[in-house]
């Protein structure tokens, strides 16, 4: 099992897919990495040589921000927006959607479970 950037890559998947298990690497970025290192997209993780694994590791460490570094940068960006008091920072602080989505209905992922409040009872 190949281990890159602290992530165990699945053995039986194609490299194009296996690299997406690293936080910050999607399909497109995965294809760019493989093209730059000269490794086939269709090669399986279990068939990688140690040389190829070290080549991948060197390329990713040298050119990309992934895993912990990327997570820290995203958190720092959110903290900065909260501190400067911009609209996006206020939305983050209140736990509401940041990018203009509606909140009258939906937005349950950000707002959490519904809190039932006592309302008017129906007249019979």
UniProtKB/Swiss-Prot annotation:
A Pfam family that the UniProt record links to this protein: Ribosomal_S13
Gene3D superfamilies in the record: 1.10.8.50, 30s ribosomal protein s13, domain 2
Sorted UniProt keywords: Ribonucleoprotein, Ribosomal protein, RNA-binding, rRNA-binding, tRNA-binding
Membership in a protein family: Belongs to the universal ribosomal protein uS13 family.
An annotated GO cellular component: small ribosomal subunit
Function: Located at the top of the head of the 30S subunit, it contacts several helices of the 16S rRNA. In the 70S ribosome it contacts the 23S rRNA (bridge B1a) and protein L5 of the 50S subunit (bridge B1b), connecting the 2 subunits; these bridges are implicated in subunit movement. Contacts the tRNAs in the A and P-sites.
Subunit structure: Part of the 30S ribosomal subunit. Forms a loose heterodimer with protein S19. Forms two bridges to the 50S subunit in the 70S ribosome.
Protein name as annotated: Small ribosomal subunit protein uS13
GO molecular function, one term: tRNA binding
Region (Disordered): 97-124
Source organism (scientific name): Mycolicibacterium gilvum (strain PYR-GCK)
């Amino acid at each position: 099992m190949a281990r890159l950037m602290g992530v165990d890559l699945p053995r039986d998947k194609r490299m194009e897919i296996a690299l997406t298990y690293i936080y910050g690497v999607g399909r497109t970025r995965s294809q760019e990495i493989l093209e730059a290192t000269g490794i086939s997209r269709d090669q399986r993780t279990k068939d990688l040589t140690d040389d190829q694994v070290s080549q991948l590791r060197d390329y990713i460490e040298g050119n990309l921000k992934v895993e912990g570094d990327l997570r820290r940068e995203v958190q720092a960006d959110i903290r900065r927006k909260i501190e400067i008091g911009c609209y996006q920072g206020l939305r983050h602080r209140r736990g509401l959607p940041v990018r203009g989505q509606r909140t009258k209905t939906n937005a349950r992922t950000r707002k959490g479970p519904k809190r039932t409040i006592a309302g008017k009872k129906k007249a019979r």
